[in-house]
């Protein structure tokens, strides 16, 4: 059984991380620099 505290941290941290990445990518795209999206 997973510890409730660890489970709560993971469930709270993952959506925030995904949202942060999406916001960062959207802000960079909004600034007019879509050329760096397909370089990886």
Curated annotation (Swiss-Prot):
Chief place where the protein resides: membrane
Keyword Electron transport set for record: yes
SUPFAM superfamilies: PetG subunit of the cytochrome b6f complex (SSF103446)
Entry's transmembrane regions: 5-25
A GO BP annotation: cytochrome complex assembly
Role played: Component of the cytochrome b6-f complex, which mediates electron transfer between photosystem II (PSII) and photosystem I (PSI), cyclic electron flow around PSI, and state transitions. PetG is required for either the stability or assembly of the cytochrome b6-f complex.
Family, similarity comment: Belongs to the PetG family.
HAMAP family assigned to the protein according to its UniProt record, in alphabetical order: Cytb6_f_PetG
Record text on subunit structure and interactions: The 4 large subunits of the cytochrome b6-f complex are cytochrome b6, subunit IV (17 kDa polypeptide, PetD), cytochrome f and the Rieske protein, while the 4 small subunits are PetG, PetL, PetM and PetN. The complex functions as a dimer.
The protein, known as: Cytochrome b6-f complex subunit 5
Organism: Gloeobacter violaceus (strain ATCC 29082 / PCC 7421)
């Amino acid at each position: 059984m997973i510890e409730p505290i660890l489970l709560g941290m993971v469930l709270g941290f993952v959506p925030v991380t995904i949202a942060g990445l999406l916001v960062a990518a959207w802000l960079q795209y909004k600034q007019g620099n879509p050329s760096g999206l397909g370089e990886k």
